[in-house]
Amino acid sequence: MAEGLTREVRMEVPDTAELLRRSEDISGAPEGERLILNMGPSHPSTHGVFQLLLELDGEVITKAIPEVGYLHRGDEKIAENMQYNQFVPYTDRLDYLAPLANNVVYACAVEKLLGWEIPARAQVIRVICSEMARISSHLMGLGAYAMDCGAVSVFLYTFTEREKIYLLIEELTGARFTTSYTRIGGLTRDLPPGWTEKLKDFIKQFLPKVDEIEGLLTKNKIFVDRTQDIGIISKEDAIDYGLTGPNLRGSGVDHDLRKKNPYLGYEKYDFEVPLGSVGDCFDRYMVRIEEMRQSCRILDQALADIPPGPIAVDEPRGYLPKKSAVLTKMEELIQHFIVVTQGVDVPPGEVYFGGENPKGELGFYIVSKGGGVPYRLKIRSPSFVNLSILPKILPGHLLSDVVAILGSLDFVMGECDR
């Protein structure tokens, strides 16, 4: 039987593979020595295929090593062999809890490289889609987080409201998860008749539900004890590790791309950016609660001012003509053939575009050598970056705190591993 690992040996462990090898048999480790615990890659609280290697001294964590990559699909390499519009469905599978928001950011990145400005109506509809995705993502994150911390009933409240949003998304896009709603230069279809009124009705009944959900958690002693002063991330650490989204703002850093670097006309909307003061799990929870209210505020303004007009740019090289025209006119038939076989003709150049997604800043860095296929596409995943701070904040906490800290970061492995 292998000998237990001493404190001195632990400090010399060079990498994850060595940790795994040396932790194969620790059942006979003498008292006072440390233990390696494999959490995952299949564990309920990770909400995805994610492994966390924990070094324990009793119940106290002394070292943490996140192990990612189990859900790697090679999305960036796939993009190099696909036309720009063909890659839209792959963005659904990044943060699959907010596919609409992924669609929007990717389309904006390609349009920035093309130098296109989409019509005002399409911009407003994209804002609506992004904020609906933010609400649905936060509902999922908060419900699962509460359940992980022992408040199972809250999960039922959040999922009931999330289902209402999915019904609206399904009516708009034709799908609940794999929406693929955007196209380079616009959208696949316009708003269905009566859809905006349904969304207004949802917002009206949803705001009291947010208060109800908050009431079930904010004054819940068990939830408060498990989240307050747990997993504290200072402003300096949040910035140094490149955190974005609610995890950054929960530490009190006022950074929101919708305010700092407005896109899609976000500068026209009146909304607040909620901030935390301590940077603990509770602050990150409160930021997401308030963000849902602010998203409803943005949606109200957007629904009140949806301009008429087209939903796509007037660029024949980038958009399919109407089917009726393809069947009757030679020019439209040729245009249809070129767009389908060659894709959008993007000029040579490189561009980065980042959008404020529910998990943080989702960015696309695209290099083009001309033509309809990118030379290189790099995805800036907020979940991947946010997970990088775990080795910093987990040591010193109890093993029971790990679940609360992981849930407060609200990561999704489809986007992290891509």
Curated annotation (Swiss-Prot):
Keyword Metal-binding: no
Oligomer status and interactors: NDH-1 is composed of 14 different subunits. Subunits NuoB, C, D, E, F, and G constitute the peripheral sector of the complex.
Entry-linked HAMAP family: NDH1_NuoD
Keyword terms of this UniProt record: Cell inner membrane, Cell membrane, Membrane, NAD, Quinone, Translocase, Transport, Ubiquinone
Pfam family, one: Complex1_49kDa
Enzyme Commission number: 7.1.1.-
The protein, known as: NADH-quinone oxidoreductase subunit D
GO cellular component: plasma membrane
Gene3D superfamilies from the UniProt entry: Cytochrome-c3 Hydrogenase, chain B
Recorded topology in the membrane: Peripheral membrane protein
Catalytic activity reported: a quinone + NADH + 5 H(+)(in) = a quinol + NAD(+) + 4 H(+)(out)
Function, in words: NDH-1 shuttles electrons from NADH, via FMN and iron-sulfur (Fe-S) centers, to quinones in the respiratory chain. The immediate electron acceptor for the enzyme in this species is believed to be ubiquinone. Couples the redox reaction to proton translocation (for every two electrons transferred, four hydrogen ions are translocated across the cytoplasmic membrane), and thus conserves the redox energy in a proton gradient.
Domain of life: Bacteria
Family classification: Belongs to the complex I 49 kDa subunit family.
InterPro entries in the record: NADH_Q_OxRdtase_suD (IPR001135), NDH1_su_D/H (IPR022885), NiFe-Hase_large (IPR029014)
